Amino acid sequence: MAKKASDHVKYYNNPDGPVIGTVSRNIIERDGLYFKDLDGSGEYQPFDDWRLPAKERAKAYVKVLSTDEKIAQLFISDWRMGKYPCGVEGHQVVFDESGILDDAWVHGKNIFGEQHLPGTTELIKDWFARHLILRANPTPDDLADWINQLHAVAEECPHFVPVQVVSNSRNENGETVFGMNDAAGVFASWPGTLGIAAAVRGCGIGLVDDFADCIRREWDAAGLKKGYMYMADIISDPRWQRSYGTFGEDPKLVCEIFSHLIPGIQGSSHGVTADGVAVTVKHFPGGGARENGFDPHYEMGQWNVYRTEGSLSKYHLPGFQTAADCGASSIMPYYAKPSKEKSAPQTDKDGNAMELEPWGFAYNKPFIDGLLRRQMGFEGYINSDTGIVHNMAWGVEMLDGPERVGFAVNQAGVDLISGLFDHQYGREAYDRGRNGYYDTHAVPEGFKKEELVLTEEALDRAVSRTLTELFALGMFENPYRDPKKAAQTVSDPRDWDHAMDVHRKSVVLLKNDGTLPLSREKIKQKKVYAECFYKDGERAKKATAKLREDLKGGLFCLTETYEEADYAILMLYPSSGEYFSATKGYLELDLCDEKPVFDVDTEGRPSGTTHLETTLKGVKRIRKIAHAIHGNGGKVIGNLNITLAWEVGSAEPYLDALTAGFDTEQSAVLDVIFGRFAPVGKLPVTLPRGDEVLAVDQQGVCVSPNDVPGYDKDKYMPESLKDENGKAYAYRDTAGNYYELNFGLCII
């Protein structure tokens, strides 16, 4: 294809019906209406008819597709834009004739697996891949051009199926992290999801409607029609690194948020619409019940542990029930598998004992088919987490690749497998059900042949479910978007202003002895010292320079010498651990610099050796700075960026005022500090009081239950740890306030 698709889309307007957009596909006229010729027959077929229900069209169209075309649609994987770096060292882009698609072969390798991949045109035409994950961070017009080009290539295939480009969320501020927060800063940038929760608690649920509507309009304008978003997981183990991305620890609040978020993004409360964006809710049945923070991206974190009776249904399932009730288009199971040996009895929605089969949740029929579908009433499709066939195949390691595909799709009920384009495994799983493979090969112990092969029935079920989404989104009729309109929509200053307003509303005032706000009268002609603290010292220096630049021009005098200052403003941005790899010990939550902490053994128990951990470089200097400022009769203000439930005891006692943000814009925090905006946010998560409430014994059991949210942990804590108010878990500051769920001060 030599032409740029965006410049050659032809549109056909239907009265009281959808616009049909095409670059090269035949258009059928019938009853005075226009329909796209999906199967290339040149004749009207019922599945061409946009007047029919999406599910009906999908079930009819799946019968037309070849076996290989259907198998290809079982898989979704990362894909690259030619104009933007693909992350593969040494890769040389070979553009197609349009100058948009990368048609070079590439050897792709990441933490999810390894694969030799063709160019984009070949992937779409010959492999018939139709589900791609975008991790690049392009401009909206480049994104629309690229997606348009993908659809135009797909139109040249005998059977037209549009290309579904999927992304993790793009509308929150924060540090970009592969596989978690791939892109930020292009689409309207709201605070992190914890900040959204903090603002909702302070200002009401209405802002979620605005947040969702912004996402829907921006994504639809650019042609992005599905998002891996958002997380209905509850924070119950504070050491879980994916606390970032959740809406906190309160199941009721998560349910309330999702009851507005899903319909707002998808376009209705009954599923997706043509101007909506499909939502994939993560990570069923909740990833918060970790075993002392270990993450299932690596082997030590492969278990979900429910040590508290009934915790699964009480805390972890409600958000997913709301997702099912609101018509979420798809749900993503977590990598982990449940531990029967380490868990107390858990019940399903009907009060029956749950089968805690030791299979990853994407392979776990009792959870996916029995609980989620039959009892919770979920009607969308199941989209696995990325890498379940290769590096994160917890519980089914004894199966080979084709058997894992067959077991996930045929037995557990997965409809879309994220990771690599494993169509060859899918074909082998399909053929093994027909070629007598298991007449000469042993069936792995504990499994049955019919569980491990890919049946026609399971294949059609899975593909018809994903096709239903594409039909409902209107992508068969018109998948094309105007790049100029995409750029205009995403740059709308009203959305950016609204997002900034929520940044301000997300700020939580944790401590104040009358220091805040820093009014004109307080700071006029005063000397102010400002510094940023990070885990990385070099990053802290750069951030400090920017902070000081932002503070120039005020009524006060900036000084780089804290010994002479009247006020200090300290911005604290701690971080801990790695997303995809295990730490030597338990994930550190203390604000510390080279703190000796225990290693863990291969079973996840504390060992006798130690190593040094840093979450906030130079944190010990806060005490020195405070001593000097207080000696001058001055005040120290701190702001803590909460991405995890930090232990704040090494900083809070030295601060006269303390605010908290959640990947909140620094300018919004300064608006609160200087009295330009009154703080209204409330904590969406409890901050633990210290290491003593997170201690793990020699059996690997934490003193505070990892499957219970912070607000309820005191019910299960030893009496010896409780204070005179019966509280053990939450941090209590020097003013006597507990930093627990929903806490936040006001300025009167």
Enumerate the predicted regions with their spans.
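Glycoside hydrolase catalytic-domain context in secreted enzymes
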Residues: 1-748
